[in-house]
């Protein structure tokens, strides 16, 4: 059945208390640990190599890493080690909710104390980007970014203005999106809204609380996120003027690298399925990538070429073609948060 969602886990572990599961909605999975739960004991060195395609653990209980330089897949498991390139890298501290910079040269994650850290891919150069205040839980950072537009000046200083880490902050059970400059600076709330003019004129304002699971994509600072009370997925775009669009029922969204498509989780007949659709306003058709699911597929991530979606299952990590042309195949027995290095 549905796994638990993660946005309250990091602080709960850091404070060594027990947190209850928080349901996203009846339309999506419950918030689960997904690599944000710290494991005890020594780091495990994963075996390099391929994967099992049965959707079940490898025969004999053998651990299958499933990551490689070719497939760009990485897996953070809530321990000190992160699986990548067919092996594991020891970061010297607990790594939860790892995300990559747009150029693949840095990672950002939540450490065992609940703070935001950045580091090089080999775990070196760790730096504290921001410290979580007491009583707040931070989770699921994503690296927002924008490229210089073709006009060169449509949005002044867009590369610096949108070079941010966006994450979820949970204070007293109230969820909000917050952001901090990737180069360091003050933490401030990111409040998705609609401007009073332009295409969003007259549109209702989206919820300001209950927002979680931000995911950045594309070259114009787009952010997908979920709203827990509504059980809805949204896309926020303030590149030219603020505009927030309701994509529909679901949770745990991820934008494709070009921001042209979105994948999200929705519960169907007792299991969590993966759905995709275009982000274009006039293309609302959805496709179930897992129509015959007999297990839960959660926490999806796009490959750099946009052709593959990886997702967590109770048995590890599976991948599925983004066009739905084949059934999911298990590639790793490691249980954690899948994310692709650009």
Which residues fall in each region the model found?
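Sequence signature of WD/YWTD-type beta-propeller architectures
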Residues: 2-342
């Amino acid at each position: 059945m549905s796994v638990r969602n993660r946005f309250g886990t990091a602080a709960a572990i850091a404070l060594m208390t027990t947190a209850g599961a928080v349901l996203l909605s009846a339309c999506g999975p419950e918030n689960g640990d997904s690599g944000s739960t710290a494991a005890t004991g020594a780091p495990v060195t994963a075996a390099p190599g391929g994967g099992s395609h049965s959707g079940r653990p490898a025969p004999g209980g053998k651990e299958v890493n499933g990551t490689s330089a070719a497939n760009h897949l990485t897996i953070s498991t809530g321990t000190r080690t992160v699986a990548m390139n067919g092996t594991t890298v020891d970061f010297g501290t607990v790594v939860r909710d790892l995300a990559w910079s747009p150029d693949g040269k840095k990672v950002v994650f939540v450490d065992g104390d609940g703070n935001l850290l950045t580091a090089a891919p080999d775990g070196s150069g760790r730096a504290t980007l921001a410290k979580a205040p007491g009583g707040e839980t931070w989770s699921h950072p994503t690296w927002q970014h924008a490229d210089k537009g073709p006009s060169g000046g449509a949005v002044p200083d867009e590369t610096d203005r949108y070079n941010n880490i966006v994450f979820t902050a949970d204070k007293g059970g109230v969820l909000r999106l917050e952001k901090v400059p990737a180069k360091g600076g003050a933490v401030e709330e990111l409040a998705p809204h609609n401007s009073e003019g332009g295409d969003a004129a007259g549109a209702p304002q989206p919820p300001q609380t209950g927002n979680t699971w931000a995911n950045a994509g594309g070259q114009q600072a787009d952010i997908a996120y979920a709203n827990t009370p509504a059980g809805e997925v949204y896309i926020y775009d303030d590149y030219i003027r603020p505009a927030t669009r309701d994509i529909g029922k679901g949770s745990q969204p991820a934008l494709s690298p070009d921001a042209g498509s979105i994948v999200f989780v929705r519960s169907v007949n007792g299991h969590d399925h993966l759905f995709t659709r275009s982000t274009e306003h006039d293309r609302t058709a959805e496709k179930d990538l897992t129509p015959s699911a007999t297990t839960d597929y959660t926490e999806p991530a796009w490959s750099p070429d946009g052709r593959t979606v990886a997702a967590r299952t109770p048995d590890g990590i599976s991948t599925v073609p983004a066009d739905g042309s084949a059934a999911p195949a298990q590639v790793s027995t490691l249980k954690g948060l899948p994310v692709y290095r650009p």
